[in-house]
Curated annotation (Swiss-Prot):
It is a single-pass membrane protein. Part of the gene cluster that mediates the biosynthesis of the phomopsins, a group of hexapeptide mycotoxins which infects lupins and causes lupinosis disease in livestock. The role of phomB within the phomopsins biosynthesis pathway has still to be determined. The pathway starts with the processing of the precursor phomA by several endopeptidases including kexin proteases as well as the cluster-specific S41 family peptidase phomP1 and the oligopeptidase phomG to produce 10 identical copies of the hexapeptide Tyr-Val-Ile-Pro-Ile-Asp. GO terms for cellular component: membrane. Glycans are attached at N248. This is Phomopsin biosynthesis cluster protein B. It is found in: Membrane. It comes from the Eukaryota. It comes from Diaporthe leptostromiformis. The lineage of its organism: Eukaryota, Fungi, Dikarya, Ascomycota, Pezizomycotina. The chain crosses the membrane at residues 87-107.
Amino acid sequence: MESIAKAKSLPNKGRTYDSQRPWNRDSPFSFAAWWSTPSTRYLKVDQPSGRDEHDSLDLEDEDVSKYLASHRERQKRRASCAAKAKVLIIGCAVISLFAIIGALGFALGRRATLPGSCASPAHQNPHTPPHPRPTKGEAHDAGHSGSHSSSSSTNNHHHSHDDSPPPPHVGIDKPKQCGESPDEAQSRGCIFEPQLTAWVAPECAFPAVVAEYQDAVGDMMTEWPWFWDTGLQKAVSPEEFPSLQAGNYSVVYTPYQASHALHCLYCWRKVSYALEHGVDWMDARCHQFYHQRHCAFFIADKLLEMEDWRAAAEVDVQGRLTTWTYPLLYHNCVPLSSTMES
C-alpha cells in the first residue's frame, strides 16, 4: 500500500485519511473524483506541494485497479439500464399514442352508426318494437327512383311515387358515385339497371340479377307502354326503345299497373343475391330500410285489394281444388352474413 501511505503523508489543509475507508469523500481517490479526467483528479488534491507530489502516487496499486474496474463495470450497467429505460419509455409512449388514436377512431365509428346520424342509416334494436306499419296512403305515396304515376282500373284512386322525400338519416348531399348524366355514369364504369331505372356503381350492380329478372318478367323497356309526359299523350316510339334500354333518357312515365310491385320484388331479389354470394355492398335504394318496409306493405295491400284472389279458389289441371298447407314450424336462427343455404 505504498501509494496510499504516501498519500497519507502528504500535507493537507484539515483533511483526514481513514485507512479503513480509503474511498471516503476527502480521499484523493474519492468516488466523485473518478467521474472526472485524471488531470482534474490531481488538481483536487489540496496540498501545498501541488501536482508534483501527487503524480508520484502509484495509480496502478492493486486496490485502486480493483476499484477502477468495479467502477467502470457499474458505469456500463448504468448506461445499459439507462438505454433500456429510454427504449421502454419511448415504446410505452408510442403504444399509448396508438391506443388513443384507436379509441378516437372507435368513438367516431360508434357515433357514425348511432340513430339519427347522417353518416349511416339507423339500426333498429331487435328488442324494440318494429316500425309501425305505414298507412295505406303512405304505402301508395312512397315510391322508387323511377318517377311514375299509375291509376287503378278497379277504382278511381290515383297515387304518385315521385314526391316521396327520403328519410331524415339519408345523406342526400353526398357526392354521387355515378355522376349526374348517362355519359358520366358510363365513364365511371356504372351499370344501368332497368328495374331501378338507375345507373348503379359497379360494386353494387348485379348484371346476373338484371338478366335473371328480365328472363322472368320480360324486358320492361320494350314491353311496357311508355310516355314522355304525365298526361300520357306523347308515347315513346319503338325507335326510341334502345335509348330507354341503354339508360339514355331523363324521365319517362308508364301506366303499367304491376310496375311498382315488380320494382319492389327486384330489390328484394338483389338483397337475397347479395346475401347468397357474400356481397358487401348494396345500392342505396334497395338498401334503404324505409323502402323495404314500404314495399312489403304496398304489395300486401295490393294483394288484399284483389277481391278475386281472395274469393276464387285455384283449380289444378285435373279440376281438383288447390289448397295451401301451413304446418306449425320451429325455425332456428342463422347468421345474416352466412352464404350457406339454410
